Amino acid sequence: MVSPNIKSYVENTLSKDEFCLLLLGNNQNKDYTKKDCFILMGCDESDYWNSNQLEAGVHVWKATEQSIKVVSNWMNFCLDSRIIKDDKSVLSEELTSFKAHRNDQSILTNIAIMEGLSVSNQEFRNFIECDYDYWYERYPNSNLGRDIDKFLIKIKDA
């Protein structure tokens, strides 16, 4: 669920030179990216391993030549089954902290690091709720300070 006020947040956050806004997650990329993904994308370095992984479910893109190129690159990597599938890595052993592969999320994170893409701080979360069905169960125990909380209350009370 997205708050209607996200439009003004994005407009105020993105500079004229930026073409995307990506949401940074809390997990390290090395914990949720299989080794073959790093190797086949040319990203098998500590800068990629030790960065926080992005959340691939929520992102904002401006339609520009550069964004189309980046998204096409993302799609092409996603079409390579050796990179996207959960199959065990064959080119090298997994990193010691590896837990699971996050597929398109792992690929997007590697591309964002490679291309130096814009990443939002946690303020972005004030305007989104990924688990809005669950939100209605837990909202009486929330502080309700986010913009999205106010919007969801309006919907619930309508």
List the predicted regions and their residue ranges.
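Glycosyltransferase catalytic domains, chiefly GT-A lineage
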Residues: 1-158
